[in-house]
């Protein structure tokens, strides 16, 4: 696995402290994309410690809002995410991780959590 730290611990904490953890459980939303294709693979949550671990190890870490703990993506499945880019949005309450996905991103075994077609159709009323 070719994970490379994206920041020193000091830089990582500076970045983590600059974010706005206003979402569930004191987290930022993390949108995960394939670095080559831009495909959205999953959405997760990160607390400050998950941000620091991600930046200092180069492997995606998340905060489980249900289990109330940090987890390393791939810790049980081996389906790691090697982080190549870490971006913050203008409000500091969301981040984008551009990753090399090892195996499936979704717990169902699918490459992406967004691979199922929508179960409903939306019709636009062009006359309105």
From Swiss-Prot:
Q: Which domain of life is it from?
A: Archaea
- Known catalysed reaction(s)? 1-(5-phospho-beta-D-ribosyl)-5'-AMP + H2O = 1-(5-phospho-beta-D-ribosyl)-5-[(5-phospho-beta-D-ribosylamino)methylideneamino]imidazole-4-carboxamide
Q: Which Pfam families match?
A: PRA-CH
- What's the chief localization of this chain? cytoplasm
Q: Where does Mg(2+) bind?
A: 89, 91, 93
Residues reported in the UniProt entry to bind Zn(2+): 90, 106, 113
Q: Which GO terms describe its molecular function?
A: magnesium ion binding; phosphoribosyl-AMP cyclohydrolase activity; zinc ion binding
Q: Which GO terms describe its biological process?
A: L-histidine biosynthetic process
Pathway the protein contributes to: Amino-acid biosynthesis; L-histidine biosynthesis; L-histidine from 5-phospho-alpha-D-ribose 1-diphosphate: step 3/9
Q: In which compartments does the protein localize?
A: Cytoplasm
Cofactor binding note of this UniProt entry: Binds 1 Mg(2+) ion per subunit.
The record's GO CC annotations read: cytoplasm
Q: How does it assemble?
A: Homodimer.
Its function, per the record, reads:
Catalyzes the hydrolysis of the adenine ring of phosphoribosyl-AMP.
State the family it belongs to: Belongs to the PRA-CH family.
Q: NCBIfam families, from UniProt?
A: PRK00051.1
Name under which the protein is recorded: Phosphoribosyl-AMP cyclohydrolase
